[in-house]
């Protein structure tokens, strides 16, 4: 009698969906108040002028203007520079 013992079940085979983190508005892009600029875990990029930060470290625009990424000392900073009205 040819029989085979039942194989054990694998404990692998799961994965979680990606969290959709990263830069949402590029350097020089126009934003309006409330636009999300960066989604991140921790403050990899710090908020600068006219930029707010949420409790999950999301960086968002407080005013209309152009996005500007800078590096000051060891920190990456994002600002929103207002465009002068004509």
From Swiss-Prot:
Superkingdom: Bacteria
Disordered: annotated span: 1-22
Family annotation (InterPro entries): Ribosomal_bL27, Ribosomal_bL27_CS
GO cellular component assignments: ribonucleoprotein complex; ribosome
GO molecular function terms listed in the Swiss-Prot or TrEMBL record: structural constituent of ribosome
Keyword Ribonucleoprotein: yes
One Pfam family here: Ribosomal_L27
One BP annotation, GO: translation
Leader peptide range in chain numbering: none
Entry similarity comment: Belongs to the bacterial ribosomal protein bL27 family.
NCBIfam families: L27
UniProt protein name: Large ribosomal subunit protein bL27
């Amino acid at each position: 009698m040819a029989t085979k013992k039942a194989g054990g079940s694998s404990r692998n085979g799961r994965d979680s969906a990606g969290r959709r983190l990263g830069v949402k508005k590029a350097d020089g892009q126009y934003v309006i108040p409330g636009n999300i600029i960066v989604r991140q875990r921790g403050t990899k990029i710090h908020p600068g002028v006219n930029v707010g930060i949420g409790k999950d470290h999301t960086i968002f625009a407080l005013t209309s203007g152009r996005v500007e990424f800078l590096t000051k000392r060891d920190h990456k900073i994002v600002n929103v520079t207002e465009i002068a009205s004509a």
